[in-house]
Amino acid sequence: MEKENIYGNWSPEVIKQFKKWQLRTILVTMVGYAIYYFVRKNFSLAMPGLTAQYGISNTDFGIVIGIGSLVYGFSRFVNGFVVDRHSARAVMAIGLVLCALSNFAFGFGYNISAWLVGADPMATQATPDLINMLVLVMALTIVLNQAFQGVGYPPCARLLPCWIHPSELATKMSVWNTSHSIGAAAAVVACGYIMGSMGQDLSHNPDVINTIAANLKLDPATADGMKQILQYARHWDAWKWCFWLPAGLAILGAVWLFVGLRDDPRSVGLPELPDTKTGKSDTEKDTRATRSAFLRVMVWTNRWIWTLCIANVFVYVMRMGILDWGPKFLTEARGMSIEDAAWAVAAFEIFAIIGTLAAGWATDHIFRGKAHRMCLVCMVGASLFMSLFIFLPGLPMVVSIFVLAMAGFFIYGPQALIGIASANQATKEASATANGLAGIFGYVGSFLSAIGVGIVADHWGWNVVFYLIIGIGVLGAITFITMWAAPRDGYARSQNFYANLKK
């Protein structure tokens, strides 16, 4: 469809107003969703500080992250139904307020834990009972936060198709998708700065030095050991500000969303977009049985949907393995400061933005809309650069960061394209169900990444973690190979379904 025909017989003034609101909706939701990441990915930068002060293990962190991932996936699936029945604008804003409250609670988690066990919250040495209570409080607040995080995406999935014509949706959604990486990159840089500049300077306290040395298993007699110890001793309790400051930003973000968004064109006196109804004839209505049969054909028995779901597990294990655990690995195994580790993960996300846009362009212009073929290229590229990163540890830091960033360039292509491929294979009438199913599989991958990385890192070390991540990338590539012959979309399958229904 040519661009000038997208708006049918609308007047120039109506088109101008519609485009203004379309751009406004895209920008407001991009900023709002990026702020959701500030109160989600801050935990990754706080983890090294929590380990240094309280000796919390990678296994404990992994269990918390893993359970949170499952809660997030379930919440996102359920809230898709909630948003269909309520104001997407209000739901998205309220979700961000609730995330802010859970982050404020996490920042006060140590004080709450001390009160519950009757300990002194000002003490620099925590008792085992206090640490156990802290882990429990931490788990509860993270799980609550992940439940509220699941409110963030469904409103966007409902709002954007109301304002963007189907012929432009893939291109503009790929641009919108960069909000994930923009938010994550900004969050890790901001929290990296917080961890390296805020908190109390207790480097003069020998008890603090000994506590950190014991928790991180470092020798204060060595220069490298003391350097790492001091970076935490000089910024004691900085981790708390990684939750309080983003929480304040989230409150402002909620106001931004509520003021800036409208649910659909009709709410501002504009007409609905032409050609945004379902693919079947306007007079045709599905019965419950027909709808159930359609979903069975297009989703539940569609081999390509299930292949994409399985592939999404591998994609999320790779992506979240780096995003959730990158700061800890880089500080503990590569000896980086928290600030440098934050910039490394930020570079990973910045390159991911470029990779997402490049993958979308290549899908349309090289692979003629067959997103699964571009996903194969991306998984091979991500596995290759992860191999270079782990097997060449002696590279200069700048080169190492570049290699890690190139892994981000490739891994975010499938993360964005699987949603588009699922929608195409299921057709727009079943795209929400297909994406919900793929999303659940993705966060099963997050759960496996969280639990697996924590346990493996504690028992066999960080190198083994990355060997496994590379292996996961290879399995993902093999999965996409099995889709090479798949069609671009499922519309022929859908037409065949309705043709058979009329016989």
PLM feature spans:
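Cytoplasmic helix-loop-helix junction between adjacent transmembrane helices
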Residues: 141-180
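Cytoplasmic membrane-interface "Motif A"-like loop-to-helix N-cap segments
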Residues: 85-96, 365-379
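Glycine-rich segments within core transmembrane alpha-helices of 12-TM secondary carriers
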Residues: 171-199, 352, 439-449
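Extracytoplasmic gate region of multi-pass secondary transporters
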Residues: 43-47, 302-357, 415, 449-450
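C-terminal transmembrane helical hairpin of 12-TM major facilitator-type secondary transporters
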Residues: 369-418
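Residue-level signature of mid-helix packing/kink "hotspots" within the transmembrane helices
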Residues: 41, 69-77, 184-185, 349-357, ...
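Juxtamembrane intracellular "pre-TM" segments in multi-pass secondary transporters
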Residues: 7-19, 267-307, 498-503
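C-terminal ends and interior cores of transmembrane alpha-helices
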Residues: 97-130, 380-394
